[in-house]
From Swiss-Prot:
Record has DNA-binding as a keyword: yes
Segments in the Periplasmic topological domain: 133-362
Residue ranges, compositional bias (Low complexity): 193-221, 246-259
SMART domains hit by this protein: HTH_XRE
Main localization category: membrane
Localization, UniProt: Cell inner membrane
Family under the similarity heading: Belongs to the RodZ family.
Name this protein carries in UniProt: Cytoskeleton protein RodZ
Organism of origin: Yersinia pseudotuberculosis serotype IB (strain PB1/+)
SUPFAM superfamilies: lambda repressor-like DNA-binding domains
């Protein structure tokens, strides 16, 4: 009987009961044991009551019991076999490894995505290039159209550039109009006479210094008698008489200009008859060309001051009635100043297009 009772007592003594008895024999509380083992009081209580936590792995549970046994001086070899019978070790669940084919599928999908992305980038670049090319072609066509219009205007004017004159410019005297003399006999002015007038006007200083006194005027410069019907050359005589007022007072009656003969100085063109003589007047435009450029300038009255192509290194001075409307084929090929102030063309240069602007607006 005693043997059976001892066996039942041994079976009933679980690891938790033995640990609790050893703790009580040492006079330790559950709180003290929890602090020494760095565990929760609830964990110590579950160990003494042989309650295995569901969320706690069996390996950790066995480790807690071994630490508890060392603390209360119990042999581990006596507790572990009982623990294995009571709570066998559970096999850990191992997740199955994924196949390498999944990685290949991801790579294949990423490859398609990158190909589609590159396709979109190439389409965007192609559209951008096509848009730029169309704008470039439109600008070139517009410049060519302007050049054709300028050439047509020049051909309509007989191949001569548009004259640049103002209200104060002198008119050119006709070269083939006959000059009337006394007795109704016309004295034709030949091309030789016209060239003589021009030469005498451009060399007025030399003519003034070389004119003799009234007492020594050569007879070859005198107008013939009124009953003469042969044409004479009167250009040098008229020019000399009007340049020398004192000499004309002492000329004989036969040398006095006849009624109907022009006595005023012949209007002569300046050295640059196509351009206004004054470049510093109010409303003047000065353009310095660094490269070949097509240009058209129209003043406030609608007059075309210039239309054509200027070569690099040229300087163009224009004067008219402000404001001016300018059309420039290549804005980067010139600099413009109006009344001494530079005109800003940077926005047209950056845009790389034909410049259309108005200068001199008050």
């Amino acid at each position: 009987m005693n043997t059976e009772a001892s066996q039942d007592q041994t079976v009933t003594e679980t690891p938790g009961v033995r640990l609790r008895q050893a703790r009580e024999s040492l006079g330790l509380t559950q709180q003290t044991v929890a602090e020494r083992l760095c565990l929760k009081v609830s964990t110590i209580r579950d160990i003494e009551e042989d309650n295995a936590q569901a969320n706690l792995a069996s390996t950790f549970h066995r480790g807690y019991i071994r630490s508890y046994a060392k603390l209360v001086h119990l042999p581990e070899d006596e507790l572990l076999p009982i623990l294995e019978k009571q709570a066998p070790v559970r096999a850990a669940k191992v997740a199955p490894m994924q196949s390498f084919s999944l990685g290949k599928k991801h790579k294949k999908r990423d490859g398609w995505l990158m190909s589609f992305t590159w396709l979109i980038v190439l389409v965007v670049l192609g559209l951008t290039g096509a848009w730029w090319w169309q704008n470039h072609q439109a600008q070139q066509a517009e410049i060519a159209n302007m050049v054709d219009q300028s050439s047509a205007q020049l051909s309509q004017n007989g191949g001569q550039p548009v004259p640049l004159t103002d209200d104060n410019s002198d008119a050119i005297a006709p070269t083939d109009a006959p000059a009337p003399v006394a007795n109704g006999q016309p004295v034709p002015l030949t091309n030789h006479s016209t060239s003589a007038v021009t030469n005498s006007a451009t060399t007025s200083s030399a003519t003034t210094s070389s004119v003799p006194t009234t007492s020594s005027v050569p007879k070859t410069t005198l107008v013939p008698k009124t009953n003469s019907t042969e044409p004479v050359d009167t250009a040098n005589t008229n020019t000399t008489m009007h340049q020398e007022g004192a000499a004309s007072a002492a000329v004989s009656p036969s040398q006095v200009p006849q009624p109907g003969l022009s006595t005023g100085p012949s209007p002569l063109p300046t050295a640059d008859a196509g351009v206004s003589g004054s470049t510093s007047s109010v409303g003047a435009l000065v353009m310095n060309f660094t490269a070949d450029c097509w240009l058209q300038v129209v003043d406030a009255t609608g007059k075309t001051l210039f239309s054509g192509i200027q070569k690099g290194g040229a300087v163009l001075n224009l004067a008219g009635k402000a404001p001016y409307k300018l059309t420039i084929g290549a804005p980067g090929a010139l600099t413009i100043s109006y009344q001494g102030n530079p005109v800003d063309l940077s926005k047209f240069i950056k845009a790389n297009r034909v410049a259309r602007l108005t200068v001199g607006v008050e």
